[in-house]
Structure formats: structure tokens, C-alpha cells
Amino acid sequence: MTNIRKSHPLIKIINGSFIDLPTPSNISAWWNFGSLLGICLILQILTGLFLAMHYTSDTATAFSSVTHICRDVNYGWMIRYMHANGASMFFICLFMHVGRGMYYGSYTFLETWNIGIILLFAVMATAFMGYVLPWGQMSFWGATVITNLLSAIPYIGTSLVEWIWGGFSVDKATLTRFFAFHFILPFIIAALAAVHLLFLHETGSNNPSGITSDLDKIPFHPYYTIKDILGLLFLIQVLMLLVLFSPDMLGDPDNYIPANPLNTPPHIKPEWYFLFAYAILRSIPNKLGGVLALVLSILILAIIPLLHTSKQRGMMFRPLSQCLFWLLVADLLTLTWIGGQPVEYPFIIIGQLASVIYFSIILILMPISGIIENHLLKW
């Protein structure tokens, strides 16, 4: 009799994806982030579900309903802060995952990479809409500023913004629809993640050396299930340290003030994980130009496979490209810092320089370094 996990129509899919999956024997801890992202998504859906049981998406009661969750619901404060800080952990894992893909040349799996970019946009949209729901000052003004960017689109811009708002300003209709979208999007993300995995398993995983590993594959279970559990323990430890000791460290104090359309906060800024893109947006004095730069800062990932000039897949044996990669990481950290600073000298010029460096590294310097390294191979 054949094993049920290999014959049952449903269980054999799980078996092929998580148990008997042939995996390269040399993948490092940088390959942990895919499973961690899956766990983050499940955690966010579960905590979000419990929050939705007590939340009301009405401008009059949204803020007080969140307060009610924190004060009156059993462990409501913990569920709320796990959800808020879980989003931060989600983005840390996302950035690491994308960075790993760039470093080791995983973008040569085109379908997997492109679905990954769609996933990134979907997660960013979900996080943005989630930030609006508590209806604090930063929620309201963040929603106003970011949705207003669409008015830069020629001809249809203003109509589009009012259509999204459901009126002439961010109001009850906006909050209700944002809640609806924030609830449905994680399930769409889960479906996209399954497709992401489907395409990945068509080709098999990449590995640090960048060369084919078909000759040296090992089963996913028990080797990588154990390795992933170690990563999971680290993730939960960091998350619970944040939740239990400094739950508001990554948040904005202004969001504890109820939304007031008549009073603008001194510095409107998004959550920390959007600051790099926000800095790029602010560094261009033109509204439409800024919006284009903002979108391109993420969409640029889609053309990375076209800019690959090296004969080698990853950067493991390419010191010049490694230097550029870590320069890019430093540049993104600089942009993140600048995004949280007020719009004044010297922050404006630093932001503009960092934005130029960001696009220059990806579009110009990395392809050139690939060509130089190809020539060095001939020596």
C-alpha cells in the first residue's frame, strides 16, 4: 500500500511542497525568510480577525473602539500590538527576502520574481490601509496626503481621488472602504503567495553559489523544517520583545490623538517601512515627478533581470558588485532616516543625493560592474 501522503490528492500537494521537496543542500539562513513571511501572514490574519471582531469602521467610533480593545477586551492590548508590530516584522522579513533575491540573482526566475513584486505592492497597500483604521491624527493625515498623490495623474487625477475618497475629503466612506479592502487583501496575498511558491517549485530553489544544484538535493523535511523553526523562534522572540516591552517604539505618538481635519500635525510621515519611498517622493520638487519616482523606486525591481550583465548569477564571487550592493543597503537606510526628518536644510539635499545614488546604483553602476567583472574573469 502506498503512503497516504504520497497518494491522497490534497496531502500529496503539501508533501511535494513542504516534506519531500528536493532542496539544495547548501542554502543558508537567508533562505529562511520565505517561510517566515508565510508565518507573519498567518499571524496577521489571525490577530486581524480578532481585532475586527471588536473594531467599528465609523469615524465617530473607530478611535474609541481601538481604545476599547486595548482596555476592556481580554488580552486586547496584546492582540493589537502583535498586529501592529507584526506588520513591522513582516516588512523586515520582506526587505531581507528581496535583498537576498537581489544578492544571489534569484530574479532570474522571472515568474517567481514578478509575482513577488506584485506581492510587495499588495502588502504595502494593505499596510497603508491598516494604518488609517485607528483614525488617529497620523492615520487621517497620512490617508489624505498619500491618496492626494493620485491627483497628480493628468486629466483624471482629481476625479480619481474623489472616487477613492467616496466624497470630497477623507471621511466615513473612506474609512469603511479601507477597512473592507484591508480585510480582503491578506487573503488575496495568501493566494498570490501560493502561486509564487508554485512557480518557484517549477524551477527549484536557487542557492548561494548560483550554479545548478540538481546533483546535490536533500529532502526539505527534516533538514529545513528544523532550520525554519529556528528562524521562527528568533522572529517570535523579537516580536514579543517589542510587544511586551516597547510596543509603541515603531509607532507615531500623534496617532494617540483622535483625527482632527482642522489641525495638521507638524510632521506628516508614514510608518518606518515606507520612509525610504517617502524620502524619494519628497526629494523631487514636482508633484507628478515625485509620484513617478515613488512608484519607480519599487517598480525598478521589475527591470533588474534585464540589467543583469554578469556571467555569474549571484554576487558570492563578485567583490565589486558586493560593494555596490552594501552601498545600496546603506543608501536605503539613509533614505529611511531622511524620510522621518522635517523638510529643511540639510535633510532636503541629503535626500536628493540619496535618491540619485539609489537609482544610479541599480540602473548604471551594477550593470557596469557586471561587465567589468566579466573582463576580470579573462585575466
From Swiss-Prot:
CDD domains in the record: cytochrome_b_C, Cytochrome_b_N
Origin superkingdom: Eukaryota
Single annotated GO MF: ubiquinol-cytochrome-c reductase activity
Signal peptide annotation: none
Positions bound to heme b b562: H83, H182
Sequence positions that bind a ubiquinone: H201
GO cellular component, one term: mitochondrial inner membrane
Membrane topology: Multi-pass membrane protein
Note: Heme 1 (or BL or b562) is low-potential and absorbs at about 562 nm, and heme 2 (or BH or b566) is high-potential and absorbs at about 566 nm.
Cited function: Component of the ubiquinol-cytochrome c reductase complex (complex III or cytochrome b-c1 complex) that is part of the mitochondrial respiratory chain. The b-c1 complex mediates electron transfer from ubiquinol to cytochrome c. Contributes to the generation of a proton gradient across the mitochondrial membrane that is then used for ATP synthesis.
Full protein name: Cytochrome b
Provenance organism: Prionodon pardicolor
Organism ancestry: Eukaryota, Metazoa, Chordata, Craniata, Vertebrata
